[in-house]
Amino acid sequence: MNQDHFISIIPGLSDVLGAQSSRQDALELLRNNSETYRKFQSFPAGEQNKLLSFIMGQRGLKITYDSFFQRIMSPELHPGRLESFLSELMGEEVHIEKILPREGIRLAEEASLIIMDILVQLSDGSRVNVEMQKIGLYFPGERSSCYAADAIMRQYTELRGRLKEKFSYKEMKPFFLIVLMEHSSAPFQKAAPGYIHTEKIYYDSGAEVASLAKIKYISLDTFRDSVHNISNKLEAWLTFFSSDEPADIIALVNAYPEFRELYQEIAEFRTKPEELIHMYSEALAIADRNTIRLMIDDMKEELDSLTNQVAEQKSELARQENEIARQENEIVRQESELAKRDDEIARLRAENERLRRETQ
């Protein structure tokens, strides 16, 4: 497809991403720095083509990597953007009061698995952690519960230390954990076409008891498969997070012009190949570590499954052996019973024979 035809079927793309350039110009820009070009050549062919298309201005760039996301959605540089997304997701206007340090059990155990992680405190004291997973992690409920419990306990410790004897549990504020997954894991794929998964806690008696942990998962892959027209601001944000397709960019900017500024900031990387390739290289390295870790998890899960199967088979074999032993014991008992009956019959016959002789 030539460049003129591309522009004609996607009008307005140059207004958002800047004037388009040729493939040769894009390659020359990369070759200006030998180290940058060497890194570029080390990328898989598919990733090279995506980057070239971006530098040429023919498509956008996904920001589902920490380095890119932090540039565009940084609560320090652009608090209004994260506030806008959170307000749409939570159904009420929120304001970020401060950014909190990213610490705790998640970073100790899973730093290489999380490609974006932002923790903020809202004006009402609530805390919100927004994280992006390139590939949905295993055991999402267990992991999220542990992290939420750790975050809530840290809030409790801070309040106890600051308020001392004036502390009351009513001072505790909710902790919101929002997990965006570019490729969601099996439990969420089974819930398609639903793509926003909100944890609900109910008591069978109907009692209403507050819970501080508020957890939401968002399946961006299911969203892309299920939603084809942007009908509200939340869908606009999820489209921005999940798609780099030219048609989606144009549709989004036409529906919500405020996103033009975000795309233009992304487009600035077109003229900064060294920075672009460096950040992309880091992103791919993280993705590789994620893939390796998930492959290990896969193998562990398969090993656990095989171990359970072997245990079940051993248990079944033991049950069958016990059944055989029981049946053998039953046979011995029956044989013993038959032998007793044979002895009794022989005794009765002998008695009958004795009596018959006495009567003769």
Enumerate the language-model features and the residues they cover:
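Short, hydrophobic/amphipathic alpha-helical patches that form generic packing surfaces
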Residues: S67-R71, V179, Y217-S219, A236-S243
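Short, charged alpha-helical interaction segments and adjacent helix-coil junctions
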Residues: S8-R59, V128-Q133, S242-Q360
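Extended serine/threonine-enriched, polar tracts that run as long, contiguous segments within proteins
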Residues: D204-E235, S242
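Charged, alpha-helix-enriched surfaces in structured cytosolic catalytic cores
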Residues: L77-R81, F139, N232, P257, ...
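Short conserved micro-motifs at the rims of enzyme active sites and ligand-binding pockets
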Residues: Q189-A191, V227-S231, H278-M279
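Short amphipathic C-terminal alpha-helix that caps PH/PH-like domains
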Residues: L86, Y147-A148, L234-F241, Y263-I266
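Accessory alpha/beta interaction modules
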Residues: M1-K214
